[in-house]
């Protein structure tokens, strides 16, 4: 692949090369080789940044690919690599979008999930409530992102022995879940 990574590469070649490294990253992840997955993803984004003058770094596909990897790393309980990728994701969102965008809300949601996995209830609450606010302002409350946020807040408060809040977020989760199901009919 590296023979295509040169000073004469055009936008299409650079984009394809970046996508190849992203796919390699996903392959490593499926093989449960988290360090190699993170390294390949970093290479994919380094290529995008190297050719940023063509707008490759600003591609929303890049953000979606990063978030998919973060989610997979979290499912694999590879929190350290998830934090590395999330840091890059957050930097791109803040540089090219804003701290009120849906993408930043998703960033706060992911950070809240990481905080929960690390047993840090106070930062988890702060990040999940931030996600609830940002996502709600960006796209409303009737969507899967908000449903996920409510589910994690319910779980957090149940673990943290705050039953009133846990019940409130359970009810919000069930309300959004039913609304989303109704939209599918």
Where are these regions (language model features)?
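Glycan-recognition and catalytic cores of secretory/periplasmic carbohydrate-active enzymes
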Residues: 12, 79, 88, 121
């Amino acid at each position: 692949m590296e023979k295509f990574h040169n000073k004469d590469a055009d936008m299409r070649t650079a984009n394809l090369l970046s996508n190849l490294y992203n796919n390699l990253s996903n392959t490593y992840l499926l093989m449960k080789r988290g360090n190699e997955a993170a390294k390949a993803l970093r290479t994919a984004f380094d290529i995008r940044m190297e050719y940023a003058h063509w707008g490759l770094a600003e591609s929303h596909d890049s953000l979606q690919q990063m978030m998919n990897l973060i989610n997979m790393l979290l499912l694999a309980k590879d929190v350290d690599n998830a934090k590395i990728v999330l840091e890059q994701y957050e930097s791109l969102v803040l540089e090219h979008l804003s701290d009120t965008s849906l993408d930043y809300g998703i960033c706060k949601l992911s950070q809240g999930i990481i905080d929960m996995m690390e047993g840090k209830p106070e930062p988890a609450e702060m990040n999940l409530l931030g996600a609830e606010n940002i996502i709600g302002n960006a796209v409303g409350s009737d969507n899967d992102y908000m449903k996920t946020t409510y589910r994690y807040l319910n779980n957090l408060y149940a673990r943290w022995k705050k039953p009133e809040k846990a019940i409130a977020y359970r009810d919000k989760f069930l309300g959004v879940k039913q609304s989303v199901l109704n939209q599918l009919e």
